[in-house]
Amino acid sequence: MNISTIRKDFMIVNMGPHHPSMHGVLRLIVTLDGEDVIDCEPILGYLHRGMEKIAENRTIIQYLPYVTRWDYLATMFTEAITVNGPEQLGNIQVPKRASYIRVIMLELSRIASHLLWLGPFMADIGAQTPFFYIFREREFIYDLFEAATGMRMMHNFFRIGGVATDLPYGWVDKCSDFCDYFLTSIAEYQKLITRNPIFLERVEGVGVVDVKEVINWGLSGPMLRASGIQWDLRKVDNYECYEEFHWEVQWQKEGDSLARYLVRIGEMVESIKIIQQALEGLPGGPYENLEIRCFDREKEPEWNEFEYRFISKKSSPSFELPKQELYVRIEAPKGELGIFIIGDQNGFPWRWKIHPPGFINLQILPQLVKRMKLADIMTILGSIDIIMGEVDR
């Protein structure tokens, strides 16, 4: 008696790459057995632009406009890490007012980044309404950025020793009004999303990462804190002036997509607390360290006194990076953003190595999606929160 055998062939599906304004140029080669994911292979590099090598052929002030193209949804953080390294190498002091302004801008940028994560994440799992709501609040933040820096995105606002310009008249009151308004908006999001049974069905227990895996994979940011580890570089390293503000590290212990959502929602509330304290205690004084403009006193000024008086041309501060090695890091919206710098008594860094949080966090994706359903891939990928400009560099 012949027993007929059924031959099963796996299906290989290409997901992406998409346009950078959507999910980014990430390609996933997914092997399926029906609806079950057997394997997933991420293909990177479509947005690689050689950002590290560009840094090694530019002075820091020349390189600043490039760094806003890493994570183009949280550009204040890439600017901050770019100036923090040379400031520590050169032992340059940042005035207290400039440090407060930096903190305000960083936390506004964190909120904007989390908002633009929340909207597409909800759209991916079938909820279209929050996608339109988040742009309403994001526009207010971008209006504040435009008033202070002149640009809605790609701000080029941070400088070695301070910031490019002081806050304009009336900006503090406008920002304070936004903080009061945004707290009600977060309550609206929580009412609309957090207890929604369809939302909970899609995210609860999906993409679970335990504490041991988080540490072994080197994950950071909301991915780390959603698995029960209270680690936030704003508390650990106390860079800028975060130690002067009262706020709590947001964390969950479940480690699933819902926990990562709750961490980011809580972080937006804590960012508002930090901004309100910074606005209330904003000190007077200079917004930049004027001493860094006097590194080279021997050269004749490029413009005469008359032109300086009426055109207000600022010199471009550049100095030799001492022969040292340094690793600096900050808590970006997606995790630990770091720079490893090697100076060589030159205006250009000898080595500029970027530690991007998105690239590190993305490594665990194949493990998380195995034995899950095809529809869960977008839920898990969205909960990681990546920007391909930062991943590919």
UniProtKB/Swiss-Prot annotation:
It is a peripheral membrane protein. It holds the Pfam family Complex1_49kDa. Its main location: plastid. Gene3D superfamilies: Cytochrome-c3 Hydrogenase, chain B (1.10.645.10). Signal peptide: none annotated. GO terms for molecular function: NAD binding; oxidoreductase activity, acting on NAD(P)H, quinone or similar compound as acceptor; quinone binding. It is found in: Plastid, Chloroplast thylakoid membrane. HAMAP family: NDH1_NuoD. Belongs to the complex I 49 kDa subunit family. This is NAD(P)H-quinone oxidoreductase subunit H, chloroplastic.
